[in-house]
């Protein structure tokens, strides 16, 4: 009987070990390629501003990303450019607004981590916006709106429509100089309640609540955990390009896709209501 019990115990142990597969560390969920010259370390808190692609380089519309409580990132629709905000769950959102002559929209964050873009009229004395191969500098008063985050971590951006006054003179476009690590972020925006504030540590994005920035199964950009949401595609491999835009792997093109009164952010287009954008990194200042 003793040997029979020992045999059964050994058999059950073998079955358990065979069925067990150690989970893959989320930090290894990274793209196979990297951004050439990208910065993977930036421990000072910074925000994100949405720069939609336009017909000409001189027309720059910047919406700051906000984040709702669950970590999702969204962009709301408003008449002024807004920073990305974050709602409570970590989602990122961007509201829709009309862009003034020179405006920075900062993403805000709500309780769950989602990101949203609120409408703030904070004035910035000087704003320099880096875009591929070019740098747009404006010394006139600028409206800076930080992206917000809702409670779940989602990132949202409110809907904004660019006005004709958002055209910048081509004479102010200058080649971008190669930045060092301290100067990789060249744009500043006013920080307000709910503004998405993140740091970059060894290629991992972390929001002010300690949640991890990731591209989840449906390709949406949001903050969760740690660990990231189950089924996440990427949780590491983030960097800031030499132009000051956020990148995942070797890609710095994201998509804001309309969802009701706000946009969600994705690393790929998921349909006809999506538009390509750059996520400009911005320094956060109290105004």
Curated annotation (Swiss-Prot):
Keywords: Cell wall, Cleavage on pair of basic residues, Repeat, Secreted, Signal. Disulfide bonds: none annotated. InterPro entries: PIR1-like_C, Yeast_CWMannoprotein_PIR, Yeast_PIR_rpt. The keyword Glycoprotein does not apply. The keyword Secreted applies. One of its GO terms (molecular function) is structural constituent of cell wall. GO terms for cellular component: extracellular region; fungal-type cell wall. Belongs to the PIR protein family. Covalently linked to beta-1,3-glucan of the inner cell wall layer via an alkali-sensitive ester linkage between the gamma-carboxyl group of glutamic acids, arising from specific glutamines within the PIR1/2/3 repeats, and hydroxyl groups of glucoses of beta-1,3-glucan chains. The record marks 72, 91, 114, 154 as: Covalent attachment to cell wall glycan. Residues 22-62 form a propeptide. Component of the outer cell wall layer. May be involved in meiosis and sporulation. This is Cell wall protein PIR5. Its main location: secreted. The lineage of its organism: Eukaryota, Fungi, Dikarya, Ascomycota, Saccharomycotina. It holds the Pfam family PIR.
């Amino acid at each position: 009987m003793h040997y029979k019990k020992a045999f059964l115990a050994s058999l059950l142990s073998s079955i358990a070990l065979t069925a067990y597969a150690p989970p893959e560390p989320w930090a290894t969920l990274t793209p196979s390629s990297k951004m050439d010259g990208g910065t993977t370390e930036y421990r000072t808190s910074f925000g994100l501003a949405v720069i939609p692609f336009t017909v000409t380089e001189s027309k720059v519309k910047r919406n700051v990303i906000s984040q709702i409580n669950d970590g999702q990132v969204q962009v709301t629709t408003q008449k002024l450019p807004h920073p990305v905000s974050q709602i409570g769950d970590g989602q990122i959102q961007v509201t829709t607004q009309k862009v003034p002559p020179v405006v920075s929209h900062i993403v805000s964050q709500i309780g769950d981590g989602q990101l949203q873009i609120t409408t703030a009229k904070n004035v910035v004395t000087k704003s320099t916006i880096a875009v591929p191969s070019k740098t747009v500098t404006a010394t006139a008063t600028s409206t800076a709106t930080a992206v917000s985050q809702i409670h779940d971590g989602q990132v949202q951006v409110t809907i904004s429509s660019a006005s004709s006054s958002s055209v910048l003179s081509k004479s102010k476009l200058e080649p971008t100089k190669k930045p060092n690590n301290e100067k990789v972020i060249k744009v500043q925006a006013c920080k307000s309640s709910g503004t998405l504030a993140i740091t970059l540590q060894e290629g991992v994005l972390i929001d002010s609540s300690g949640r991890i920035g990731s591209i989840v199964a449906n390709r949406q950009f949001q903050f969760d955990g740690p660990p990231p949401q189950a089924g996440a595609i990427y949780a590491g491999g983030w960097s800031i390009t030499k132009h000051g835009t956020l990148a995942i792997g070797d890609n710095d093109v994201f998509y804001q896709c309309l969802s009701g009164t706000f946009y969600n952010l994705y690393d790929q287009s998921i349909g006809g209501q999506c538009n390509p954008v750059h996520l400009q990194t911005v320094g956060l200042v109290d105004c």
